[in-house]
């Protein structure tokens, strides 16, 4: 009987340890916004602990801010940049053209993209060695220094 109680206690402790470890690295998100020069930018970071696992950017650009008059002109202007994002593992990019604005959605999956490919992304900036991952804390500092504001949940 004593052995059964010890076995149950050990099993309970093991289950609790597994549950604590599973809960300790819960994915969370932070969102930042910036409106500047006719472009509204919304960045959403998904992270575990201090390590960013995914970043999604949604940029809404009026055609006037791009210096073009029409949807067709915007498509011509943005195509070359958009083409640079295609075919990179861990990166998805698309542009939706409306009557008066373009909406670009860019998603970077840091669990899939290589550090070499990450350095090829136009407009991507980072501090330090990205081969070890992207720090949420450092990303937040960098964004706030550039004028981004965190959106409260």
From Swiss-Prot:
GO terms for cellular component: plasma membrane. Coiled coil: none annotated. Residues 1-22 form the signal peptide. Residues 124-133 have a biased composition (Polar residues). It is a lipid-anchor. Residues 117-153 are annotated as: Disordered. InterPro entries: DUF1307 (IPR009736), YehR-like_sf (IPR036699). Gene3D superfamilies: YehR-like. A lipid is attached at residue 23 (S-diacylglycerol cysteine). Keywords: Cell membrane, Lipoprotein, Membrane, Palmitate, Signal. It is found in: Cell membrane. Its main location: membrane. It holds the Pfam family DUF1307. A lipid is attached at residue 23 (N-palmitoyl cysteine). To E.coli YehR. This is Uncharacterized lipoprotein Lmo0207. It comes from Listeria monocytogenes serovar 1/2a (strain ATCC BAA-679 / EGD-e).
